[in-house]
């Protein structure tokens, strides 16, 4: 009797996966080069294919934060926090965004969560 081990256990490679990886690398490069309009477009297109990519959500939120579009930034930070709720960087930028919008209680709530995660975080005291 012949045993075919592993022959049928291979999952097919997603052809879109390689394109997504290339698009993500290009997105990171655009952000590093501070080409934010192009990065926003590419990142938004990327999220249509990979909607729950934590880093892309956070980075797009950060770009909107830099553009003083705090409400839009918060929406991306919230999506990012749905994936990684203990990300201090996301919570901190979200707190700053709420502060800029004069939503002090929401900023305080973010700071409290940061202190729960990292009691020695110095950025919270600056806020």
Predicted feature locations:
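Canonical positions in the second alpha-helix
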Residues: 46, 79-80, 113-114
């Amino acid at each position: 009797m012949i045993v075919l081990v592993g022959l049928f256990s291979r999952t097919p490679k997603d052809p879109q996966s390689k394109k997504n990886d290339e698009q993500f690398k290009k997105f990171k490069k655009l952000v590093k080069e501070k080409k934010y309009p192009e990065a926003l477009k590419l990142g938004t297109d990327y999220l249509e294919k990979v909607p729950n990519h934590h880093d892309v959500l956070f980075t797009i939120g950060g770009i909107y934060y830099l553009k003083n579009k705090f409400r839009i930034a918060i929406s991306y930070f919230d999506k990012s926090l749905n994936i990684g709720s203990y990300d201090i960087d996301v919570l901190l930028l979200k707190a700053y965004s709420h502060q800029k919008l004069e939503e002090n209680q929401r900023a305080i709530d973010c700071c409290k969560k940061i202190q729960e995660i990292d009691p020695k975080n110095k950025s919270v005291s600056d806020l």
